[in-house]
Regions:
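Eukaryotic scaffold repeat domains enriched in small/polar residues
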Residues: 1-126
Length: 126
């Protein structure tokens, strides 16, 4: 996702998160797998009762693959309250395209395919 919008149930209050990165390279549309040359925007959104968690790599898919081949695994997760105001940013020491948040136990759970043990659990800050 390039843009995530937070709004109330009436739709009269909206806050927009716009992934601020370098411009999109239109020439990549003419190349096989060319989109992978552009920085990945927000990847996953996981809501809880109190917060919304959004993940992203901050890199191009090519860079992610190259880093992962070298054993350099990381990604970012941003935590927002329901009005769209930032609370916290985490840099995780693994990379995943599957993220779940347990709001009751305050844990972030990831499933990866880069590790022999694919399950990662992070205790989030209160």
């Amino acid at each position: 996702f390039k843009i995530v919008k937070f709004m109330n149930m009436k739709g009269d209050s909206v806050r927009t998160l716009n992934f601020q990165q370098k411009g999109f390279d239109d020439e990549t549309l003419n190349i096989a797998d060319g989109l992978d040359a552009n920085v990945t925007h927000y990847m996953q959104v996981s809501p809880t009762r109190d917060y919304v968690y959004i993940s992203y790599s901050g890199r191009t898919p090519y860079a992610v693959g190259s880093d992962n081949d070298k054993g350099i695994l990381y990604m970012y997760v941003e935590q927002y309250e329901w009005n769209g105001n930032p609370v916290r940013k985490y840099k995780l020491d693994t990379f995943s395209i599957s993220m779940m948040v347990d709001g009751r136990l305050n844990r972030l759970m990831l499933i990866t395919y880069y590790n022999d043990d694919p399950y990662f659990i992070y205790q989030l800050k209160d």
